Each structure stands twice: as C-alpha cells, then as structure tokens.
Amino acid sequence: MRYHFRMSSIIVPAILVSSKKELEQQLLKARNVGTDVQIDLVDGHLVSPASWPFTESPTDLDIEKILEAVPAGMTFEIDLMVERPLEVLDAWIQAGATRVLLHLGGLDQIGTLISEIKKRYGYDKEFIPELLSLGIAINVETSLDLVEPFIQDISFVQFMGIRRIGAQGQPFAPEVLPKIAHFKSKHPEIPIQVDGGVTLESAPGLLEAGVSRLIIGSALWKSRDFELTYVLFQEMTREHGMFAS
C-alpha cells in the first residue's frame, strides 16, 4: 500500500543526505509519523558540501534512481541550493515535488528564473498550477527589500535561521526574529517557514513570531527518539503563536 503525504504539516523534517540509502531511511521515518518533508538539494557549487544525488553524479541526474528513492504517490518540498535549478527541477517534480524553494541572494537573475518556472509549469502546460507552490528562501544577511519585486510571484517565504546554509546542526541566529516580525507585519497574507537552527528551545519564539511551518533537521534526526521529538514539536504548535488552542 502506498502512503500519500498531506502538504499541510506544521512540523517538517528537513532531509539532507549524501546517499540514496540515507534518503530512503529518512523518508521511511517521516512516513511513519505522517508528515511532509523538505529534501535539501545541494550541488556543491552554490553551496557545499554536495548532497545526494550530486554526490554520485555532479552533472547528470539519474531520474530512475530518484523515482526509486521516493515512494510513489508521495509529495514533498525541495530546497534548491543549486546553481542551475531548471536542470534538476523536472526530475524532482516527476518524483512528486509540489513545493519548490529558490534561494534569494545565491542566484543571479532570479526574476527570469521565476518567469521560466511559471512558463514551464503554468497554465499553458499540462500541469495543474495549484499543485506547484513556489517560495523564496531568505538568508540571514539578505535585505528584505530584495524580496519585494517577487511578492506577487510566490506562495510562501522561508527564512534561514542559520548563518551558513547547507549544513545541519548549526546554532540558531536570533537576529532573524525581527526580520520575520517585520515581514509578517508588511505581508500578513504570505505564509512563513523557517529552516535552520529550529530546536525545542527556539521553536516557541518562532511560532509566536507568526511562523506557520518549522523545517527541522538535526533536532529531529539526532534525537534519541525521532517520533517522540516530533510529537514534542507538535505539542508546541498548540501552545504558541497562531496555532495556540
């Protein structure tokens, strides 16, 4: 029986692996708690070190291996920390990706890139637009002014909670909190997620700042009990911020 993920989780495990086997193992753990996942794709050029599948083939992606690794019918989010996003996007959409993240500040001509993605997967193609959500990731040092030209083109934003992207287990950068608050006050309609440095200690403040999705890496994967830690994060969403009951 194939498991179908819902794209509505608040607590989202971030998967950053160097092998196909690791990816399959972490997807299985995430599936057991019924959650969405974010798969981090790092080409080793825009950001390093490289993640799978770039660790096996830096240039040519093996679509069949990607399809083998991801359960049929599963949908997920991809964080594209790569120099040439369009060259890898098709393979991962075939595998089930429905949310796509581009990194503002790391890519030149991001406006042209967004236009091309909309053209390829928009209303003029045999693809349902509502199934593909496009977001922009904002580094700690990136000015929010750089986001403004693309507000009408994106479905959500992701604030990076760490200073060095592409590596899990780094300390949370507290200076991101006022940036989140400022963006939330200016664009209350745009969902915000945070990736990097999300722990049981930093999560309450992020939720209270208006964050609607927490992308969590080492705090889940390096915990003694993945499922219990996931539940603890879930309980926090009911105690803090917009999800408090």
Please tell me what each predicted stretch does.
Residues 50-113:
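Glycine/small-residue-rich loop that forms an oxyanion/phosphate-binding "nest" at active or ligand-binding sites
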Residues 9-15, 37-39, 74-80, 100-102, ...:
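Hydrophobic faces of well-ordered beta-strands that scaffold small-molecule active sites
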Residues 44-57, 140, 146-181, 185-187, ...:
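Glycine/Thr-rich beta-alpha phosphate-binding loop at enzyme active sites
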